[in-house]
Amino acid sequence: MAETEKIEIMNFDQDGYLEDGRNLVETGKLMCDLADKVADEGYDAVFLMGVGGTWDELMQLEYLMNKFGDRDLEVYLIHAAEWNVSGHKRMTSNSVVLTASESGTTPEVLEAVKKMKSMGVRVIAMTSPEGPIGQAVGADMCVKMASDHGAGGCEKGYYLADCFGLRLLNRRGCFPKYDLFIEQTKDIWKDMLDIRKKFEPTAEALAKKYALAPYTMFIGSGALWGETILFSMCILEEMQWKRTRYISSADFFHGTLELVEEGVPVVLFKGEDEKR
């Protein structure tokens, strides 16, 4: 394959990424405060709402909250476009919704937020307070998700969402090591840079070998299932027009296996949880 352009993982503002990380730790404290506010007020159910990539990102929090939560905790992952046409019978004025929009203009999320607010539902948004969604939610219920330097990836959204969700669990007595989680992740941004640097040669080799494959399969599970979908759909299909097939490890042997043949790359996302 002739190389027409060289793309490097580390070709971004690394100092800016680290600065964003430091700022994000402070922003995470705001998410913790919002979780405390919700816990103090009380709630009957937690809804995690996204569309496209944000829906994929929130999937890991749904997994964690259901894994560590008590039997009375109700957590639902909802797709904004689907909720707009079908609603959800368990959503009441005592429910709380966490959503996200880096642009602040996602049409489906904006429509849903307006409807939810009219129902008296509390909505917390990871978005700019100046955007349409932020204005609909209210500045006091917004935490800015977008990075100031345009560097990095979904890990920033993951971090903020987890600060909120895991704090709710902590307040229920279900996640006692919340403070340890915050302490151990405060410097993770440097580690993320180191991982990128170490993976650069491998990434280049994989890209050269598989870039022109007719389509590629991605298998994931557990906390990584949402990331499996996001990488396949948002990174490869949407951004690079690559044909992909994402499948859960639980379902792989019930159909998709029959399509594995010579020339079709299969990528396995190997997590650290019980579904690995």
Residue ranges of each PLM-predicted region?
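Conserved N-terminal alpha-helical segment that immediately precedes and caps sugar-phosphate-binding
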Residues: 1-276
